[in-house]
Amino acid sequence: MSYDISFKVKVEGVDAYVPVGACDANITWSARKIIKKSTGLKWKNCQNNGLCVDVIPKIEVGLRKLEQNPDKFKEYEAPNEWGTVKGTAQFFRNILNDWNDFQQWYEELVQVATFWIE
């Protein structure tokens, strides 16, 4: 199983969210501990994790931590070698690249876009 990320906005007047733009970032569930420890996020699967403008800075911090001190997070790597520090750092880079694209393409939605883990 893997975590797939999407950026969504709420449909006005309806209890529904629709995906906007493209986020191709995904990673194995085995990376959960590394993600949570490096970002401080709760990382709630199959739901809205808050506004992107609040979540993205925590992912930026997590990436810096993984790049500056990868050995600190090695203990959280999965025994099956699927959830690695290196892979998680690349996952964060993919999210950040897709968010940068989103900001350029959908400037008017940046403040209302939500971060979904599916």
Regions inferred by a protein language model and the residue ranges of each:
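Acidic (Asp/Glu-rich) sequence patches and key acidic residues
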Residues: 1-118
